[in-house]
Every structure is written in C-alpha cells, then in structure tokens.
Amino acid sequence: MIIAKNERGLKDQIRLILDKWSDFSEADNIRRFNEYIGLRLRLRRVALGLTQTKIAKLLNVTFQQVQKFEKGVNAISLSKLVMFCEGTNTDMDYFFRILHKLEKKIYINGGR
C-alpha cells in the first residue's frame, strides 16, 4: 500500500478501505484493519507535528517499526496503541469508533 503524503490523501485512503470492507475475506479485512489503524496513527502523528523517531521513542521501538505500523505491514499491539494514546493525549476512540460503522455496514449487506 502506498501511503498518501497529506491529510486529505490519508482520509481518502481510509474511506476507500471502509467502502470496500464487506467485499473481502476475513483475512483481507484483518490486513485492511491493520492498514486503517496505521493510517489513523500516521494522520494523528502528522497532525501533532511529531516525527516517526519521536513516536518510536515513546513506544520503545525503532522508527522502522513505526513505519511498518503506519503502513499496516505489522499490526500495532493494543499495549503500544495505549502507550501512543497516553503519550499523545489521544482518545482510543480515535482509532476504534469505526467499528460500529463497520458492524452496521456488514449487517446491512447481509452479514458479509
């Protein structure tokens, strides 16, 4: 996945992931969910004016690992996500409010 360079591009990528959510297998959706979380992570980091290196120090990982989180290559653990939220004063809802929308979309589309 190519990551957009600006906020609008990131939001467009997020919208694309959500629009296609119920069209894919469970394994594809897990990958897309990791991409979604990664894009939200990047969007928040950029909005706060933080570098990947600063986030890496906050999470006690390398900046390369932060890159992988942001690209959805590696899933960020819940404990690391909590560390990110606490260290950047971000509500966890910022990442997970989408789950309700996805549930609704999947239900409307007949359970798939």
In which residue ranges do the predicted regions lie?
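N-terminal flexible/basic segments that precede or flank functional cores
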Residues: M1-F33
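Short, charged recognition helix plus adjacent turn
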Residues: I2-G9, F96-R112
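Short basic helix-loop element that most often maps to the first helix and adjoining turn
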Residues: L39-K54, L58, M83
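Short, basic-rich loop-to-helix N-cap that marks the start of a DNA-contacting helix
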Residues: V73-E86
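Conserved hydrophobic/aromatic packing and binding residues within compact polymer-binding modules
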Residues: L41, I55-A56, V66-F69, F95
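Short amphipathic helical patch at the helix-1/turn junction of helix-turn-helix
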Residues: E35, V46-A47, A75
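Recognition helix of helix-turn-helix/homeodomain-like DNA-binding domains
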Residues: L59-I76
